[in-house]
Swiss-Prot record:
HAMAP family associated with the record: Ala_tRNA_synth_B
Membrane spanning residue stretches: none
Top-level taxon: Bacteria
Cofactor: Zn(2+)
Gene: alaS
Function description: Catalyzes the attachment of alanine to tRNA(Ala) in a two-step reaction: alanine is first activated by ATP to form Ala-AMP and then transferred to the acceptor end of tRNA(Ala). Also edits incorrectly charged Ser-tRNA(Ala) and Gly-tRNA(Ala) via its editing domain.
Cellular-component GO terms for this entry: cytosol
Binding locations of Zn(2+): H562, H566, C665, H669
Reaction catalysed by this enzyme: tRNA(Ala) + L-alanine + ATP = L-alanyl-tRNA(Ala) + AMP + diphosphate
Major subcellular site: cytoplasm
Protein name (Swiss-Prot/TrEMBL): Alanine--tRNA ligase
EC number: 6.1.1.7
Listed InterPro entries: aa-tRNA-synth_II/BPL/LPL, Ala-tRNA-lgiase_IIc, Ala-tRNA-ligase_IIc_anticod-bd, Ala-tRNA-synth_IIc_core, Ala-tRNA-synth_IIc_N, Ala-tRNA_ligase, Ala_tRNA_ligase_euk/bac, DHHA1_dom
Amino acid sequence: MKSAEIREAFLGFFEEQGHTRVPSSSLIPGNDPTLLFTNAGMNQFKDCFLGQEKRAYTRAVTSQKCVRAGGKHNDLENVGYTARHHTFFEMLGNFSFGDYFKRDAITYAWTFLTSEKWLNLPKEKLWVTVYATDDEAYDIWTKEIGVPAERMVRIGDNKGAPYASDNFWTMGDTGPCGPCSEIFFDHGADIWGGPPGSPEEDGDRYIEIWNNVFMQFNRTADGVLHPLPAPSVDTGMGLERVSAVLQHVHSNYEIDLFQSLLTASANAIGCSNDNQASLKVVADHIRSCGFLIADGVLPSSEGRGYVLRRIIRRACRHGNKLGAKGSFFYQIVAALVAEMGSAFPELVQQQSHIERVLRGEEEQFAKTLEQGLKIIEQDLAELKGTVVPGEIVFKLYDTYGFPMDLTGDIARERNLTLDEEGFEREMEAQRVRARSASSFGMDYNSLVKVDVATQFTGYSATTGSASVVALYKDGQSVTHLNAGEEGVVILDTTPFYAESGGQIGDSGFLLAGDARFDVSDTTKTGGAFLHHGVVASGSLSVGVQVETQVADEVRDATKLNHSATHLLHAALRQVLGEHVQQKGSLVDSQRLRFDFSHFESIKPEQLRALEDIVNAEIRKNTPVVTEETDIDTAKKKGAMALFGEKYGDSVRVLSMGGEFSVELCGGIHASRTGDISLFKIVSEGGVAAGVRRIEAVTGAAALAWLNSAEDQLKEAATLVKGNRDNLLDKLTAVLERNRLLEKQLEQLQAKAASAAGDDLSSAALDVKGVKVLATRLDGQDGKALLALVDQLKNKLGRAVILLGSVHEDKVVLVAGVTKDLTGQLKAGDLMKQAATAVGGKGGGRPDMAQGGGVDATALDSALALAVPFVEQGI
């Protein structure tokens, strides 16, 4: 049996036993913030087992997509090197919420595994374990099912504590728990390993394929087990494992599902499909990456996004090891969709998105992969001993974007281990995100290297005098820049703010006699401030004195937006909750953009509350206070720090509205909150899983936005011959009149179609005693065609009808079969053929079906399918 057939057989079997087929939940747990990813079938039913949720059914069956990579359940480092470790797997499961219990659960499992109608596994190959004191389950297995005692194993507390056992399941230290019974398959004496509970149980001969968990107790804090009033059942069977059993192979990578992915991986890389660990890594990782992206996860430097990035980069590195040239990983998505898209339609819907995300991440990593591999080869060649120091591991992570487990893979191939504690110390000390090459043209920060510490005077001034200490052109040090040349100027002192903390760098100009350098941006590398721009006139040389001038209007507008960002952050935590954290920001002179963690879209009333809170703080006109202090003192005062930012011994604490907003910030700000004048949110939306974005304007820009909105209201009122006071009433009246006119139009179209039906019936062909009518009626919508098909069926008698129309640039199709023919000819079957022909899809009942497509040029060809459909079916 193929994997897809096994999945469907499992779901079908339990549906026959009265179970409701429940779709797989997302890989992002919706009801359990303690989980990084969904990793078991029972995750979506957790509240049902806890008695906190009641559903319309008490029996459920699922095929749940699961990921184990990152967090407590992390199989990543073993993937590709063992027969059964995966980052992604499918868990088949049946569940009872206070309905049936041990006897039925055991009987169902045995019947499905051994019945000739279902999997038909040889009974003598199956072993069973039960919890040591679970006599009830043992007796059911031996006395009712008939499993001989020699293939039954009692497993006690083998993990060092009461009820700490492979055969006793707990949800936590307290709560629902109970014994479990596992079913093992014996692969045969030619494979090393012993039965469960034996010293050789870790071998590959006896493989667990099904686990039945019997939740019958509630464990209280004192460790006492109390019987649950309504015991439940939670079972799980890995699809990949049972597929290996039924396909008579000993590795999950040999099953049909993986064979197609291995072939596609080899083709994309350009290597042979041999039994190579790296190829298995790629084939495994395309599943977890594809499904995670389909469920809304995007590569990032933290949380779920970072786990995804690690998996992608591990796959890229293994592809590189096999000789991949250029981007290859995204090319395997099509094979994944072909293999699993029918069971998980989200893959089909998201295919192009998945490919774009993978290709983008792959191309970004390719910029540093080759250089990073050279560095690690050099470091390992010079290594003394068998442990890779944490400093090297961190350097690869920080500079080249190598996740620790990717470096671990490389070390493992050389029988080396990593100094993980040393790596964690480096991470804790530095607190910086991985740095990768910029994708936005030349990055002067990475090219300009100068041992200069520029003195910043911009907190209190926008002008001043300074000396040019260095000049750079195309990343190379030069002694002068001439008119028209772009470059970088480094000064000994500057009022120009360097881009940091989301605030853009200052712009302005430098003057030295007849020379003028227009500054378009200011950045920072080390202690040096880099003034990017172009020489507008004259020539600029190292050592000359210049007069500095920041663009005041741009600076003033920018600092208002920056201060408003702090007020917004504080307001968000008030309105949405303390979980809100800044995930990114961009502050310029036009508007502010603020990204933050939040799990759902923001309601209109919440947006209004945010505006009200921020504007209230603005009206209070309190002073914006800055204080230089040490990091520990700042944190004790409640100052919020940005995750991933590096802070020195001395930090700048910015307070607004007393304790309303207290954050660490080195940016330029307003003097008082009243300077902001006005705050207006102009957009809100999601940018990634769990990340929302708000854009807003302040001051004069906010007033301009409101004036524009007022102008649009006036224009709309004029169009409906009203005014601002009665605009809503006027619009409602227009919409109601439009609705009535549309209804009248439908009625007229139906009458026209009915009249056309009289003419059309005479055009029907006689095919083997069946009236066949296939014609196009452009301009008619689906509703009109449905009514016409009903009318034609009554007029024609024994008939098959296929009508098509091009309506609003799309193809509309309706098929009908009179009921006396539905035993031989089904409208849904005809519709599938016709809809496919026009690049779409369709279906329906045996007597009536609807569909459509996008290829209007193929409509006549689609209609021509009706006659052969009848000829072949009668």
